[in-house]
Amino acid sequence: MARQTRKVSPTKIKKRTYRGIVYIQAGHHNTIITLANLRGEVLCWSSAGACGFRGKRKATTFAAKKAAEVVAKKSREFALNEAKILVTGPGQGRETAIREIFKAGIKVNVIREKTGIPHNGCRPPKKRRV
């Protein structure tokens, strides 16, 4: 019988994207950071919860810093050197996450604030009586 040779497929090659968009969603309870290319296809993401923080520690600035470090480390695989930053939400980790992206050596073109402001939208929850 003839021996069959197995074809070894090469490992998946990461696409080189030199420009991208960093989305920072800073909520009251968590900070989610997403890195996408200019078409909007997600390359990588991280959050305070994914970095191991639980409960009210997810809302801290330190947790947002760690999440931004993880995304910055992953961005090196894609050779990202220029980015737009789009920030949404009222959370604490906004400025800390932006600072970490600067520290990673990514050149930032634009920082855009996209937090929605209601024009007398939803009724707020009732006041707590403790």
From Swiss-Prot:
Ribosomal protein as UniProt keyword: yes
Entry superkingdom: Eukaryota
One protein family per Pfam: Ribosomal_S11
Molecular function via GO: rRNA binding; structural constituent of ribosome
One of the protein's GO biological processes: translation
Cellular compartment(s): Plastid, Chloroplast
Gene Ontology, cellular component aspect: chloroplast; ribonucleoprotein complex; ribosome
Family: Belongs to the universal ribosomal protein uS11 family.
Cross-referenced PANTHER family: 40S RIBOSOMAL PROTEIN S14/30S RIBOSOMAL PROTEIN S11 (PTHR11759)
NCBIfam families in the record: PRK05309.1 (NF003698)
Protein name per Swiss-Prot or TrEMBL: Small ribosomal subunit protein uS11c
Originating organism: Tetradesmus obliquus (Green alga)
Taxonomy of the source species: Eukaryota, Viridiplantae, Chlorophyta, core chlorophytes, Chlorophyceae
Gene: rps11
